[in-house]
Amino acid sequence: MLKYLLFDLDNTLYSRHYGLENNVSRRIFEFASALLGIPPEEVRRQRMEARKQYGTCLEWLMTEEGFTDVEAYFAAVHPPGEADALVPDTELRAFLAGIPVPKAVLTNAPREHADLVLDKLGISDLFTHIIDVRQCNFFGKPRREFFEYALRTLGVNIDEVLFVDDHPFYVEGFLALGGKGILLDEDNFHSDYTQPKIRELKEITRYIG
């Protein structure tokens, strides 16, 4: 029995075409470039090599480079006004409100970013929990620890949750634990993906029984 819908935040609850996530990625690489003294392109290369070991750039920097000033990182990556392009989404609100299943957000971003985005979209009150990367010692998706923390927080078993994310790597991490996960692939970038996939959020109703 489905007891919870667990949503990623960025590029899942709003379209990737707003460009917010691209700007976040750019600021991450710029921050790491300044920190390490190497070009952003080299940061990107090293980060991609370490992607399977570290789900987030922050975890990579903390583990491999001994980085500790987490709040400086978040301040640089998530500046004021970063979500100004977003507007209240009344259609999304009506859709989510019409699903009679509790909903939560699981994000690799800090809580203040999640609050900002959800407030801009006008859907903050529709989620019982916002589970952010700070709550699990900065271990993010697809780390087992983060998923298990989310399940404990929600008080459910993994087979009672449907997880939706726009990153195959993160969905596959949830699937590997025995969960049910759906990839939101808005522009069909992952045409060879063999697990359940949707192009827009409204299609999740096919998987809610």
Language-model regions, residue ranges each:
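Asp-based, Mg2+/Mn2+-dependent phosphohydrolase catalytic module
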Residues: 1-3, 97, 104, 110-111, ...
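N-terminal helical cap/lid subdomain that shapes the substrate entry/recognition surface
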Residues: 1-90, 112
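Alpha-helix boundary/capping residues
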Residues: 50, 77-80, 99, 121, ...
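Residue-level marker of regulatory loop/turn positions in helix-turn-helix DNA-binding domains and
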Residues: 84, 88, 106, 139
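Catalytic-core regions built around general acid/base machinery
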Residues: 91-100
